[in-house]
A protein has these predicted regions:
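Catalytic, metal-anchored helix/loop core of enzyme active sites in primary metabolism
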Residues: 1-195
Length: 195
C-alpha cells in the first residue's frame, strides 16, 4: 500500500482511499474553528500541495501550501507559534508546479465521507461509532478478511444499529467504541457462517 504523494502507514493509506480520514478532519475542523458543517467544504486535490484554505467574507482566500510532508504539520503543532527549519525539508518550488487540480468529491462514490458528515451533524455518540467501526473494518481489510468496499458498508451498519447517546460521558464513549468494534466483528462472523 502506497499513497501517491504522502509517506504514511497502511492504516492511514486506507483511510485516505476511503476518505474516512477526510471525514474525521471535517469533524476536527468543526470543533477547532467553531464553524458549522455546512461551512466546511472538502475538495479532491490530487497534487496534495494546498493543505487548507479559508474564504473570508469579502471572498478572498488564504491557503496553506507546501510539499506533502506530515512532518511539517507535526513540527508546527509542537513549536507553535514559532516556525522552525524543517530538517531535510524540501521547499515548494512554485515555478515547477504547473497546474493545481481541485474537484468536488462524489459523495456516492466516497460514501465514507457522507457517513462522516452524518455522524458529525448528528453528534452525540455517533462519531465514536463511526471511528470505532472504521478502525476495526480497516484492520480487517488489511488482514485480508474483508473486501475494500465492505469497510464503509460495515461502518454504516454499525451506525444504523447504534442507539444514540446525546451527551455521552468518557466512560460511555469507551464502551461505545468497543461496542462498534465488536459489532463489526460480529457482522463478519455472521456473514462467514451464512456462506
Amino acid at each position: 500500500l502506497n499513497h501517491p504523494n504522502w509517506s504514511m502507514g497502511a492504516k492511514i493509506t486506507i483511510d485516505s482511499a476511503t476518505l474516512f480520514n477526510k471525514g474525521l478532519e471535517v469533524m476536527e475542523a468543526k470543533w477547532l474553528f467553531d464553524v458549522d458543517y455546512d461551512q466546511i467544504e472538502v475538495l479532491i486535490h490530487p497534487e496534495s500541495i494546498l493543505h487548507s484554505a479559508v474564504e473570508f467574507e469579502d471572498t478572498s482566500v488564504i491557503g496553506q501550501m507546501g510539499t506533502p510532508d506530515m512532518r511539517l504539520a507535526i513540527q508546527y503543532a509542537l513549536t507553535y507559534p514559532q516556525r522552525k527549519k524543517l530538517v531535510n525539508g524540501k521547499s515548494l518550488d512554485l515555478t515547477q508546479l504547473g497546474s493545481l487540480t481541485f474537484k468536488k468529491p462524489d459523495f456516492n462514490r466516497f460514501h465514507a465521507l457522507s457517513l462522516a458528515y452524518r455522524a458529525g451533524k448528528t453528534g452525540g455518540s455517533l462519531p465514536c461509532v463511526l471511528n470505532g467501526a472504521n478502525e476495526m473494518a480497516n484492520l480487517l481489510f488489511r488482514e485480508g478478511k474483508i473486501e475494500f468496499l465492505q469497510i464503509e458498508e460495515l461502518v454504516e451498519k454499525a451506525m444504523n444499529a447504534h442507539e444514540l447517546v446525546k451527551d455521552p460521558t468518557i466512560d460511555q464513549l469507551l464502551d461505545i467504541d468497543q461496542w462498534a468494534r465488536d459489532f463489526v466483528l460480529k457482522e463478519i462472523n455472521e456473514t462467514c457462517r451464512r456462506l
